[in-house]
Structure formats: structure tokens, C-alpha cells
């Protein structure tokens, strides 16, 4: 089961919590859910150059508090905070209540699964060889403290007539272990040959206690304040040497 299911959904309530943190009844729930989806899509599209990894939406009474985790917060904030104020007004136009924006810097974007996936997708769109892009991203993540990385790419790789899937893995990525802190990211590269899907799993270590806020606590040590907020951190170097695998090839370990 752990091999197929989204690792984020599998671990909700165990070592991480939801990105939308509010409660509503009846038709109000559906309206707020669609509003969250609309806000996230608009922010991801508008802040594409900022390297946005995660958007958390909280809704205290008649307010909307949005926390954006980004690799380049300066792109969002702008000179003397001019851009973030304009962004806040645009987001407020999409919601009913008062909007507060909190920008948090990701200090190690090389170990963030979503940012790794988006970086590989950008390279594929620039016609970089997919194997080279995958290996570079894996090596950077392992060098900066990830305990294991797995990357899947699928589609018309290299412009081939028949679509296929290839994957690489380095270190450990225990998808069945619920206490494992596994970060997951997915995006699509739109190439001239068609769409190529990119999936990334990053293993950061194990969370031994039952703590749904473990991810937020870890990120607090890793990221630094970049707007009105703080940030968070991940695991250390693996005890064993890295192990690299490719589908169809034996391990080098």
C-alpha cells in the first residue's frame, strides 16, 4: 500500500497535519474548500519564480492567515515590501475576510521534494538530459542531509515514440513505515513532445513519537523568518554510505 498511495495523505495525523486548517459546516465547507483551491492555484502561478513549496491556510474568525514557504522570499516581498502588499490585496479580493500573509524562507531548497520536482521539470523543459537532471538533484539532496531520495519521471523521455517510466534511488526511502518522515512532491514538465510527470520522495529520518505537528516543528528549525513568520528543519546525514539504485540494475551497496 505504501508503494502506491500518496505518502503525505498516508501520514496525516501521525507525523504531519493538514495544509488547510479550519472547520466549517454544510455548504460553507464546500465554498471555503473551493476558495482554498483557487487561492493556492493563483499563488503558485503568480509566484512561480519564488520557488513556493507549501501554502498553509488558516481561518480564524472572519480572517484568513496564509503562510507561504518559499526558497526565494525576496521575490515575493519586493523592494520595501511593496510587492507583498499588492499580493495581499489581490488575495483579499478572492476571499471574504481580512487576509494576513506570512512568508517563510526555505533555507535548504535542495532537500525539499516539491522544489526538487519543479527544478527537474524546468530542466526537462530546457531539454536537459533527464538522467543528468535526476542524478544532480539526488546528489545535492544527499549532500545536504537527506537520508534517502527517490525520483520517478514518466512520459516520452528524450522524445521517444513510446512513453515509459524511469526511476533512481539513493539511500533509504521506507514508504511502508508510518513513522518515517517522507516528503513528497509532484509536478509536470510541458515539453514539445508532451507532458512528463516528475515525482520525488525525500526521506528525512523517523519521528518516534506520535505528533501531527512534527513536520511544522522540524521546519521551524530549518527555515528562517522572511516576512512576518518563522520557519522549520530536517534530518541529519545518513549513518551508512549512500546507496544508488536504478530500475533494472542491482544496487552498488
UniProtKB/Swiss-Prot annotation:
SMART domains: KH. It comes from Phenylobacterium zucineum (strain HLK1). Residues 215-253 are annotated as: Disordered. Keywords: Ribonucleoprotein, Ribosomal protein, RNA-binding, rRNA-binding. The keyword Chaperone does not apply. PROSITE patterns: KH_TYPE_2, RIBOSOMAL_S3. One of its GO terms (molecular function) is rRNA binding. The gene is rpsC. Residues 230-253 have a biased composition (Basic and acidic residues). Binds the lower part of the 30S subunit head. Binds mRNA in the 70S ribosome, positioning it for translation. Belongs to the universal ribosomal protein uS3 family. Pfam families: KH_2 (PF07650), Ribosomal_S3_C (PF00189). It comes from the Bacteria. Residues 39-107 form the KH type-2 domain. Part of the 30S ribosomal subunit. Forms a tight complex with proteins S10 and S14. The keyword Chloroplast does not apply. InterPro entries: KH_dom (IPR004087), KH_dom-like_a/b (IPR015946), KH_dom_type_2 (IPR004044), KH_sf_prok-type (IPR009019), Ribosomal_S3_C_sf (IPR036419), Ribosomal_uS3_bac-typ (IPR005704), Ribosomal_uS3_C (IPR001351), Ribosomal_uS3_CS (IPR018280). One of its GO terms (biological process) is translation. GO terms for cellular component: cytosolic small ribosomal subunit. This is Small ribosomal subunit protein uS3. CDD domains: KH-II_30S_S3 (cd02412).
